[in-house]
Amino acid sequence: MNPNQKIITIGSISLGLVVLNILLHIVSITITVLVLPGNGNNGSCNETVIREYNETVRVEKVTQWHNTNVIEYIERPESDHFMNNTEPLCDVKGFAPFSKDNGIRIGSRGHVFVIREPFVSCSPTECRAFFLTQGSLLNDKHSNGTVKDRSPYRTLMSVEVGQSPNVYQARFEAVAWSATACHDGKRWMTIGVTGPDAKAVAVVHYGGIPTDVINSWAGDILRTQESSCTCIQGECYWVMTDGPANRQAQYKAFKAKQGKIIGQTEISFNGGHIEECSCYPNEGKVECVCRDNWTGANRPVLVISPDLSYRVGYLCAGLPSDTPRGEDSQFTGSCTSPMGNQGYGVKGFGFRQGNDVWMGRTISRTSRSGFEILKVRNGWVQNSKEQIKKQVVVDNLNWSGYSGSFTLPVELTKRNCLVPCFWVEMIRGKPEEKTIWTSSSSIVMCGVDHEIADWSWHDGAILPFDIDKM
């Protein structure tokens, strides 16, 4: 067979295969149209499948047309009841890891927001990690100068707990450089504070929609908790501060229902200072452990009743839990007054367990490094120094930062008590490290019925990044 005959033969075979392929497609389409509709579905040529995910964001409605899926996103129906949250806190023996986002490690090559002030709050179906972005990404030129607390670019966003604060999964919540958020059982309420220092405004959102506002009443950096607010039987409570950070300021507790403010009370605390309260529900009341940025190395305690009456003082324990602080042996606790003569401070938390108290603190007495949680016998009601448990979460060779509280609702755990949980922020970058940026990741721990070994769940990112070397 000469070369021309070979070419003709190969071409003929190829043409035949093409024709056969076309005929097979025609037969396939004919069978699909004529036969399949009559096969047990009464001539219908589509099928709708509802796929409901454990999210508050969306439900997928998938309509199948032959071999094509048409996906619509439909709003999840509102729950028909509020969370109760009047149960007591569960007694716990230790705290086990719940999640770790590793945001800075991932952000060296991923699209991760520059953040600070992360916190966690839970609905009946999920827990979400909230954070204040700087309107910029890690390892990008816009991360320069993000050590600054307040700017028009800061926003409150959230992801499912454990996810990094990345651009692909984050949900916008509010424009904010100070914030809080909580779920009443039906919808999320978020509060974002933004605007100029002298005339800041807190915008209340409910179900993603702005529903109310609070204007600055003292004209000096209106600010709120930087952790979860607290909802009890459909009414949600939070604490705000307006005034100086290093002397007497003004403090208020607020109550809202479905995003509308229905009550507020001024908290009288002469000689004391309250900022950045970490609050949780316990036996029908809101218990808060806060930050004294003026003089005390002990932490203010605020207990709010549903009618907005309150009791305010200091954590009684004979061990200090703010930073900076002096030696434990030289500290004398007080239930009513600031002690320790230490200015500045850091956001922290505590949990009441009967008369005992779990209290978190940095391991370092002078800087935001390391983190441990102590249980002090009778520390809620007496100046006790008796440590009955201690657990290390971040060792003192690694940076920590803010910390705060939240609880797992009974709808999630199926228990008859509220599980106490806390998160620890791990700040990286400026001012302690040679970078152009400041950001953080977090570790989240929840109470369990077992003792947990000490370990260090530190941030672990290797700095500086490429952007810092330019």
Model-predicted segments: where are they?
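Short beta-strand elements that form the blades of beta-propeller/WD-repeat-like
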Residues: 127-133, 187-192, 235-241, 286-291, ...
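Blade-level signature of beta-propeller repeat domains, shared across WD40, Kelch, NHL, RCC1
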Residues: 420-425, 434-470
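Repeated scaffold domains used in trafficking and secretory/extracellular systems
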Residues: 110-119, 173-182, 221-229, 271-279, ...
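Alpha-helical transmembrane segments in eukaryotic/viral proteins
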Residues: 8-40
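Beta-propeller fold detector
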Residues: 89, 167-174, 212-219, 262-269, ...
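Short loop/turn segments immediately following beta-strands, especially the blade-tip
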Residues: 376-381
